[in-house]
Curated annotation (Swiss-Prot):
CDD domains for this protein: UreE
HAMAP family: UreE (MF_00822)
Cell compartments where the protein resides: Cytoplasm
GO BP terms, alphabetized: protein folding; protein-containing complex assembly; urea metabolic process
Protein's name according to its UniProt entry: Urease accessory protein UreE
UniProt keyword annotations, A-Z: Chaperone, Cytoplasm, Nickel
Protein family: Belongs to the UreE family.
Pfam families per record: UreE_C, UreE_N
Superkingdom of source: Bacteria
GO cellular component, one term: cytoplasm
Molecular function GO terms recorded: nickel cation binding; unfolded protein binding
Coarse class of the protein's main subcellular location: cytoplasm
Amino acid sequence: MIKLTQILTEVPSVDAKVCLTMVQRTKSRLRIVLEDGQDAGLLLPRGHILHHGSLLSTDDGFVVEVVAAKEQVSTARSDNPTLFAKGCYHLGNRHVPLQVEAGWCRYQHDYVLDEMLIGLGLQVTVENEAFQPEAGAYGGTTGGHSHGDAYDDSLEKASHEHAHGHPHKHEH
């Protein structure tokens, strides 16, 4: 299994790509399958959120580019800036991850939120699109706390298997 352990800022070339949903891009430990079918695992520093175009690397320099997967989202639109701001305010007040662009915003589909925004006067469309929420005011990490990132220690255990093929017990 390919073990992706580093987040890079730039590289001369990419060796593979992986398509991940927004929820998958919040995980630091996750088994994944690259677009070419190779098994891989994320063993990344905690607290980082991956974005479309993020670059990951193994310890030996194999580079993987992250592609934001299309997923079911709701897109709310309004030509009225005040109405649009109110809709974004109410979503933010509910701590909804939100992608904000000129005249529209996008969030993971939730019919209750859709109805709330329609009630405010926004137009809401359910779509299958890539979702790239705002990183937040603190620089794109989770701010040092978890939002349900279930820890998968099987990947960490796998990272302790060395070249001679058997696992060791390591104290942490």
